[in-house]
């Protein structure tokens, strides 16, 4: 892409030399050619930025539509994992309770018999 030659201040401050019949036609033409190039560059840049802006808006819209679906499936999957973990933990606690009753229950019964 072509680079921008003039700033607005450059255009404002441009002075043309006067010739016999006014300004030098060649100098004015060269300056205006450069101004036209700048405007074409600005126009192309604006067009490119508008296209990029439009593309990014579409991408954002698409992601916003996909986000609730993916979030819901992640929550459901996470809930399923949590439920499975809870069931596993509960099963372990039941087994531990039975084991404690078996081990400590005999000790409690033995101590009760000793007290009698």
UniProtKB/Swiss-Prot annotation:
PANTHER family: CELL CYCLE PROTEIN GPSB, CELL DIVISION PROTEIN DIVIVA. The gene is gpsB. It comes from Streptococcus gordonii (strain Challis / ATCC 35105 / BCRC 15272 / CH1 / DL1 / V288). Residues 32-69 form a coiled coil. The keyword Repeat does not apply. It is found in: Cytoplasm. InterPro entries: Cell_cycle_GpsB, DivIVA_domain, DivIVA_fam. Belongs to the GpsB family. This is Cell cycle protein GpsB.
């Amino acid at each position: 892409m072509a680079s921008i030659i003039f700033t607005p201040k450059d255009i404002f401050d441009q002075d043309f030399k006067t010739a016999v019949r006014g300004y030098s036609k060649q100098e004015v033409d060269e300056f205006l050619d450069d101004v036209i190039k700048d405007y074409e560059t600005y126009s192309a840049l604006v067009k490119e930025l508008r296209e990029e802006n439009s593309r990014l808006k579409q991408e954002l819209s698409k992601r916003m539509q996909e986000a609730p679906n993916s979030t819901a499936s992640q929550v459901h999957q996470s809930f399923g994992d949590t439920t499975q973990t809870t069931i596993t933990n509960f099963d372990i606690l039941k087994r531990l309770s039975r084991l404690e009753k078996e081990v400590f229950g005999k000790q409690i019964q033995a101590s009760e018999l000793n007290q009698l």
